[in-house]
């Protein structure tokens, strides 16, 4: 999983795969799922992210995961 945060537009993206999404499904206001043509979930986009979740907590998880992977 790859985590991207754009603080200029306050958007968080969780990349769940390398496949190119073919469509988007809005599941709630400002929360979108990127899906392939066969329905596989490949990404989650959260707009106005800092109002919906603790961004620093999410970004720190990414750092911890990367450090554990480097230790292997």
Stretch-by-stretch model annotation:
Residues 7, 35-36:
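Short, acidic, Ser/Thr-enriched surface-loop or helix-capping motifs
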Residues 15-16, 45:
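Short linear motifs in exposed loops
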Residues 23-27:
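Short loop/turn motifs at secondary-structure junctions and domain boundaries
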Residues 29-31:
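Short loop/turn microsegments at loop-to-beta-strand junctions
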Residues 44-72:
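C-terminal structural segments of small proteins and small subunits
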